[in-house]
Amino acid sequence: DYEKYMDSIVAIQKRLPDVKLLVLAYENTVEDIGVDRFIEFCLSNNLKDILLVGLKDDIIKNKIIAAGLQVSCYVQFHLPEEEIERAKQSNGFVYLQAKPYETQQINEKYPTLKDGVEYLRSCGIDRPIYCGVGVHAPEDVKLVKDAGGDAAFVGSTILKLHEDIPAMKEKIREFKAMC
């Protein structure tokens, strides 16, 4: 039920007014909610940054951008040209994969995260580049920082500690110390 999901976002926003929330949404979910309803929800709740994934084409993305929201795009570590083009045509931050999967190909021209960030900048992308996927340890945050990334997404490492709040707080401190 998307209504409960949307109500939960508003409740979190009210509980944590100083925390900037990003909305991650799959294009088919936006279609299920209704594009206009989704846009109105984001605008009325000051949720300006949308990470839109699973795009079939640019129609919905362009409609969201035209409404005044910022749409971010994901770029895999091996820097597929079509993903870079999508990022160039968008207006939000770029979500760059920080580390390759074990079986994932690596772009020989840009084998490191630093190379990837520099390449995206050379392509004319001047918006923030947030790096995630593979950021599991505090040292990974330093890797992102040293590569020129503007921020790091840390997910499962923190979420796995949800039942041990003191350990979660300590882990967050460890990550912050590397920023």
Language-model features: where?
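Active-site beta->alpha loop and helix N-cap motifs at the rims of alpha/beta catalytic domains
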Residues: 1-55
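Hydrophobic faces of well-ordered beta-strands that scaffold small-molecule active sites
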Residues: 21-25, 50-52, 71-75, 94-96, ...
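Charged helix-capping and loop-helix junction motifs
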Residues: 34-40, 108-116, 168-171
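Catalytic cores of alpha/beta
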Residues: 36-37, 78-89, 131, 135-152
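Glycine-enriched alpha-helix->loop->beta-strand junction motifs that scaffold or abut catalytic
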Residues: 42-48, 64-72, 88-95, 147-151
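Glycine-rich phosphate-binding active-site loops on the catalytic face of alpha/beta enzymes
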Residues: 45-59, 95-105, 145-168
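Glycine/Thr-rich beta-alpha phosphate-binding loop at enzyme active sites
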Residues: 84-120, 161-164
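Alpha/beta catalytic cores of nucleotide-metabolism and tRNA/nucleoside-modifying enzymes
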Residues: 119-125, 136-179
